[in-house]
A protein has these predicted regions:
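Short, surface-exposed secondary-structure edge patches
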Residues: 55-65, 211-216
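...with weaker cross-activation on analogous glycine-rich loops/strands in unrelated enzymes
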Residues: 189-258
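N-terminal capping segments
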Residues: 21-22, 30-38, 99, 104-195, ...
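SH3/SH3-like beta-barrel superfamily modules
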Residues: 58-105
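Sec-dependent N-terminal signal peptides
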Residues: 4-14
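Low-complexity, Gly/Ser/Thr/Pro-rich intrinsically disordered linker/tail segments
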Residues: 239, 250-284
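Short, structured beta-strand/loop micro-motifs enriched in basic residues and often containing a Trp
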Residues: 25-57, 199-210
């Protein structure tokens, strides 16, 4: 009896240590990260033909799309019909205001944490070219893969043929404002504007006119506030992604004038409050 008890305790201890091991997931392809574990309610719904949108036509359940080879720490596993949903954390998205979820079919599992994806910042000229190539793409809340994810049509197969626009939404085609620069830099910039307002170094603009600000700007400077970012392309042009127009170029001075109507130019985001914006220079 004593030997049996000892054997039981050894087996129990071994099993407990096995179950307590951290598990990790590695994105094998572009991996959508949502703030809900009910992916099927977003892509398909009861009819199997609709994408869940809010009153502004946005998929608010979307957080971002993880690059291939992104490493996730699995916090919890939620079984579904033929696949799992994982509650996760990742260094690529350090925002804690909501839980994050991924679909098991987009990732591979490991019990050992491996090195995260390699982050190589493209040359400045390549980043600028990447931005220009995305002109004309639609706005996608939480999107940072302009061409979308074709596997969404396989893993969440629609019940019938979709309209072109619904298929774009289903595939998560397009980028949001910070997703535009995130994709152009291969995921080397912070994903959200709440971080971009302090990213890089400040450009002093307090009290300046739109023309005076424009004269100080360099390509890839960020005109940013918590909620939106506009990216400088050259001395005359900016680019941004908006719900109304998607990815579009604008006249730099004219865009600054429109911003100054509603917001105050400040040097340091954290030094004041209210409607304001800053310029951040993160690459020379």
């Amino acid at each position: 009896m004593k030997k049996f008890l000892i054997l039981f305790l050894i087996i129990f201890a071994f099993a407990g240590s096995s179950f307590s091991q951290d598990k990790f997931a590695i994105a094998r392809i572009w991996t959508p990260v949502l703030n809900t574990d009910d992916f099927e309610s977003v892509f398909g719904g009861k009819s199997g033909t609709k994408v869940k949108l809010d009153g502004k036509g946005l998929i608010r359940e979307m957080e971002f799309i993880a690059f291939p080879n992104t490493v996730f720490n699995i916090v919890n596993t939620i079984p579904k019909n033929g696949y799992d949903i994982y509650e996760v954390t990742t260094e690529d998205y350090p925002y804690t205001s909501t839980k994050l979820y991924i679909d098991s079919r987009f990732v591979n599992l490991t019990d050992t944490k491996i090195q995260d994806r390699e982050r190589l910042l493209p040359q400045k000229e390549i980043i600028l070219e990447n931005l220009k190539l995305m002109e004309g793409y639609p706005y996608m809340w939480g999107g940072n893969v302009a061409d979308g994810i074709s596997e969404m049509m396989e893993y969440y197969k629609p019940a019938k043929e979709l309209t072109n626009r619904t298929e774009e939404l289903w595939k998560l085609k397009g980028v949001d404002c910070s997703g535009l620069i995130y994709q152009a830099t291969n995921g080397n910039t912070p994903r959200n504007t709440s971080s971009l307002v302090n990213y890089g170094n400040p450009v002093e603009i307090n009290g300046l006119s739109a023309k005076e600000i424009a004269e100080k700007l360099q390509p890839l400077d960020l005109i940013v506030w918590s909620g939106h970012v506009v990216i400088v392309l050259d001395e005359n042009t900016a680019i941004e992604s908006t719900p109304a127009e998607g990815v579009n170029k604008t006249d730099l001075v004219a865009r600054l004038k429109s911003i100054l109507i509603e917001r105050k130019a400040v040097d340091d985001w954290n030094s004041t409050s209210g409607k304001r914006f800053v310029i951040r220079r993160w690459v020379e």
